UniProtKB/Swiss-Prot annotation:
Induction info: Up-regulated by all-trans retinoic acid.
UniProt topological domain (Lumenal) ranges: 28-48, 95-104
Name used for this protein in its record: Leukotriene C4 synthase
Reaction(s) catalysed (UniProt annotation): leukotriene C4 = leukotriene A4 + glutathione; (13S,14S)-epoxy-(4Z,7Z,9E,11E,16Z,19Z)-docosahexaenoate + glutathione = (13R)-S-glutathionyl-(14S)-hydroxy-(4Z,7Z,9E,11E,16Z,19Z)-docosahexaenoate
EC number(s) on file: 4.4.1.20, 2.5.1.-
Transmembrane spans: 7-27, 49-69, 74-94, 105-124
Cytoplasmic side: 1-6, 70-73, 125-150
Chief location category: nucleus
Known role: Catalyzes the conjugation of leukotriene A4 with reduced glutathione (GSH) to form leukotriene C4 with high specificity. Can also catalyze the transfer of a glutathionyl group from glutathione (GSH) to 13(S),14(S)-epoxy-docosahexaenoic acid to form maresin conjugate in tissue regeneration 1 (MCTR1), a bioactive lipid mediator that possess potent anti-inflammatory and proresolving actions.
Localization in the cell: Nucleus outer membrane; Endoplasmic reticulum membrane; Nucleus membrane
Amino acid sequence: MKEETALLATVTLLGVLLQAYFSLQVISARRTFHVSPPLTSGPPEFERVFRAQVNCSEYFPLFLATLWVAGIFFHEGAAALCGLFYLFARLRYFQGYARSAQHRLDPLYASARALWLLVAMAALGLLVHFLPGTLRAALFRWLQVLLPMA
């Protein structure tokens, strides 16, 4: 089991560390802009950092669920690579949003594409998993004809 999920576990841990980094950035922004908890509003510079962290936190459970389902039922390497791309896009999103609301858009779209790709891989993997054996074999034969290099 460990060997089969090591890549997914690594990407998960990197994601947790990234979430911790975002939280530390909010703490730093609170100190810089003198915004004490539980306040969530202040100068626009603080609010952008705060919103970026909250937005990233809101999507993290979706990311983790699709990463693991895609990795287990589709392909661990493909899911891990897509997960790394998602995390990198989220880092760029956070950094861009901290600068200005406009700078968040390109990384936001990139992370959304990565998340949708994970959803597609997870759904396809589950579909194939639940297909009856004869249909699954026919599908794989059809794919081998369609993609002879694979």
